[in-house]
């Protein structure tokens, strides 16, 4: 028995065939998209076009002093001259986050290498309306002394280096900072201390630098050495509490290939601030996501900071790697003696660009455990290597 008229039956069959064709086409498109994404993000083949790479990550977190944090972090890696086979990777990074307590943090950075690596330009523009935890000065501070301090920072930093010899660069730099600081707790150690700069201030730093760099790759180094000296002076331009002195920064790195896929990476730093007037916000801070991972940045702070770290890197696949690291460091001054504390942990690496060796870094690190306190630790997600 024919339930549908013949014309309607033909129309139904035609519609069904069209639906099957569209569904099949949709499946093919979906498969093509999956294949393209798989090739782009998982393939072990390097892009022969030497094109740039772009990555965006969500920035989500929670802390008692900020509430819920949300935003984006992005990185663009490229060559300023793709025709130069020896040119180094240039990078532009942009990050912006907000919080449920109306705080904000914006940072734009560039690291540019020109043709033949003749010139190297670094810049940073930052606005930060963000609280930080203050524990005191020196290495003998305690979690119980933690105090929230509100801070607004505006920063502009420019640096230019010129090649003067084989792997050797000389440079000049300028940096302007404007700090606005406030603490509502009059009975806490921050307001009761004799610190300089408790309400903020501004500073202009003029400096010179010397760099030796023969690393094989600036994004993920597997062999070579890096040594940089930076000296910057802040003249007395504004109020009597603004910084008037000198910043000295030394950074040494070595990368030793132990195997085709295994690298031992080493780093040592020394940072010092000295002069007639040194505001507390210019003191050197231990911790963060680059050196002495596992410690809150500023958990220990003083006029001098000395630290070193070693990282064993195993890149078992062109797209993936694992690392283990350890470090030791301390702040110190004439008033406060040094007390070296450990840092150790491990992490995963995903390389989103094989051409530029650009990576996403997942690290978890531990620090010391002071008497009566929990062991200090931290998780880090970043769009670059620690060093």
Task: Name each model feature, range by range.
Residues 26-49:
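Sec-dependent signal peptide cleavage junction
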Residues 211, 217-316, 322, 328, ...:
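C-terminal outer-membrane beta-barrel translocator/porin domains of Gram-negative envelope proteins
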């Amino acid at each position: 028995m024919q339930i549908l008229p013949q014309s309607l039956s033909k129309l139904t069959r035609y519609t069904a065939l069209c639906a099957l064709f569209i569904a099949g086409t949709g499946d093919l498109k979906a498969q093509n998209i999956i294949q393209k994404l798989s090739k782009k993000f998982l393939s072990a083949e390097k892009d022969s076009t030497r094109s740039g790479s772009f990555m965006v990550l969500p920035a989500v977190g929670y802390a008692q002093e900020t509430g819920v944090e949300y935003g984006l972090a992005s990185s663009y890696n490229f060559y300023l001259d793709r025709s130069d086979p020896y040119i180094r990777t240039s990078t532009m990074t942009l990050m912006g986050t907000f919080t449920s307590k109306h705080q904000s943090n914006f940072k734009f950075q560039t690291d540019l290498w020109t043709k033949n690596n003749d010139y190297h330009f670094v810049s940073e523009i930052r606005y930060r309306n963000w609280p930080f935890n203050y524990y005191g000065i020196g290495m003998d501070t305690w979690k119980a002394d933690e105090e929230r301090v509100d801070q607004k920072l505006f920063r502009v930093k420019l640096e230019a280096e010129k090649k003067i010899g084989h792997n050797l660069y000389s440079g000049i730099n300028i940096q302007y900072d404007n700090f606005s600081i406030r603490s509502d707790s009059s009975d806490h150690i921050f307001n009761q201390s004799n610190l300089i700069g408790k309400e903020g201030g501004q500073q202009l730093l003029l400096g010179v630098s010397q760099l030796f760099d023969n690393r094989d790759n600036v994004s993920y180094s597997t062999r070579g050495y890096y040594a940089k000296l930076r000296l910057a002076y802040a003249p007395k331009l504004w109020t009597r509490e603004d910084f008037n002195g000198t910043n000295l920064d030394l950074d040494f790195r070595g990368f030793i290939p132990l195997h085709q896929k295994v690298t031992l990476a080493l780093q040592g730093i020394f940072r010092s601030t000295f002069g007639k007037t040194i505001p507390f916000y210019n003191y050197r801070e231990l911790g963060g996501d680059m050196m002495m991972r596992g410690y809150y940045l500023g958990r220990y702070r003083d006029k001098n900071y000395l630290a070193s770290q070693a990282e064993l890197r195993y890149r078992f696949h062109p797209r993936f790697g694992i690392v283990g690291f350890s470090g030791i460091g301390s702040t110190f001054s004439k008033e406060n003696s040094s007390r070296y504390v450990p840092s150790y942990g491990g992490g995963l690496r995903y390389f989103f660009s094989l051409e530029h060796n650009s990576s996403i870094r997942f690290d978890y690190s531990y620090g010391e455990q002071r008497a009566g306190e929990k062991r200090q630790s931290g998780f880090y997600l970043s769009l670059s290597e620690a060093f």
